[in-house]
Amino acid sequence: LIAGALLAWVGIQMVLVIDLATFLISMSILAFVHIPRPQQSAEGRASRGRFLSEMRIGFAYINRRPGLRGLLLMMFAINMLASLTYFSILPAMILARSGQNEWALGMVQSVLGAGGVVGALLLSTWGGPRKKIHGVMGFCALSFLLGDSLFAVGRSLPVWLVAAACTAVFIPFISGGQETIWQLKVEQDLQGRVLAVKDALQQFFIPVGFLLGGVLADRVFEPAMRAGGSLASTFGWLVGTGPGAGMGLMFTLTCISGTLICLAGYLYAPLKGSLAGPLGDILDRSCDHPEVSQHHVQPL
């Protein structure tokens, strides 16, 4: 996100140099960090084996726990929707609707980055909702509802900047909340296997979203939203017509779909039960850790 902001000022070569430098700094810091070996759990000892068998353990662990499985599927769908719009067509839409104004695109990317930083600072100060699942589903719904809708109807830089801020400020609460849930619910010596499977499945369709986003924009929505197009008379009042309008309509669809998916999580019994349960009644009763004392457990 910050790279998009720097692009207009320093050029692509300097952006790549800065990107490489950040990787080197991160690797250098990690070289001096001591990572303690986690205490072995009974399930962790029982699951030791070959690489493929340990990978299957990660799948089986998630599959046996409906709450974690539901959270995984919800984030899977959210990442898919985000890759259809934010990750693939947002720069093209801004350029199309701003007359190829690179400075406008850089400003939008800057606010996206700044919004994420502000959200992270708020999260570190406040800590987020007491029940973390509220932060995941509630803030995710707000991000789709506010950010996507404003990107859909916006046709000027001020509206896009507000949309970028509304989108990005909630992301740390979403990602931080769901990571907290997984780390609380999975034994420490199993987290490598389980979280690797979780990350792989959540991100599995992101490349597909990249491909579909461009194809849908170029072949379906952009032609349909041109003057006289098949959808122009129906949605033109909302997102306008002409260059970028079809991509604006795509943001409208992800706004509706993403908000409904997040709100539907409240209707899924294992997640709904975790919202209503008392202290320690977290996401999945079936995977509570007996070795974790009550005062160490936070409601999600």
Q: Model features per residue range: what roles?
A:
Residues A60-L73:
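Membrane-interface helix starts
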Residues L1-A31:
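Helix-loop-helix hairpin linking two adjacent transmembrane segments in secondary transporters
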Residues A42, M74-F76:
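Short linear capping/connector segments at secondary-structure termini
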